[in-house]
């Protein structure tokens, strides 16, 4: 799934998220894709949250990933509500598809 990301843009953020998760016994993540009804824009999103304190550790979506211009960004750049981009007014009418919520217990 992550092979489609630009290498070096998000890799350090993903490593940071992994280290955040190493101390948690449970965490959840969700994935989703959406497209505008008129077919002019498509996108995806991924987020992971610590179940214990309900905080979102990392949120990645196609808009923020593409706007980096191949520059590495701090983890805080990606910490956002997962649907901020997919549901933004800029998208207009949209169709959501393939939204999944997952939970992992160690």
UniProtKB/Swiss-Prot annotation:
One GO BP: cellular response to oxidative stress
Source organism (scientific name): Schizosaccharomyces pombe (strain 972 / ATCC 24843) (Fission yeast)
UniProtKB keywords: Mitochondrion, Stress response
Name recorded for this polypeptide: Stress-responsive protein 1
Key word Hydrolase present: no
Keyword match Zinc-finger: no
Induction cue: Expression is up-regulated by heat and in response to hydroxyurea. This regulation is under the control of the protein kinases sty1 and rad3.
UniProt function note: Stress-responsive protein that may play a role in regulation of cell cycle.
Domain of life from the UniProt record: Eukaryota
Entry's Gene Ontology cellular component terms: mitochondrion
Predominant location: mitochondrion
Disruption of the gene: reported phenotype: Leads to reduced growth rate and altered ROS generation during stress conditions like heat or treatment by hydroxyurea.
Location of this chain's protein in the cell: Mitochondrion
């Amino acid at each position: 799934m992550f092979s489609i990301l630009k290498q070096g843009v998000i890799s350090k953020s993903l490593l940071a998220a992994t280290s955040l998760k190493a101390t948690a016994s449970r965490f959840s993540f969700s994935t989703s894709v959406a497209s505008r009804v008129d077919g002019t824009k498509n996108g995806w999103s991924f987020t992971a949250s610590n179940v214990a304190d309900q905080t979102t550790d990392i949120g990645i979506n196609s808009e923020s990933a593409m706007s980096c211009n191949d520059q590495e960004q701090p983890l805080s750049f990606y910490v956002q509500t997962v649907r901020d981009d997919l549901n933004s007014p800029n998208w207009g009418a949209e169709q959501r598809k393939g939204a999944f919520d997952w939970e992992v217990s160690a």
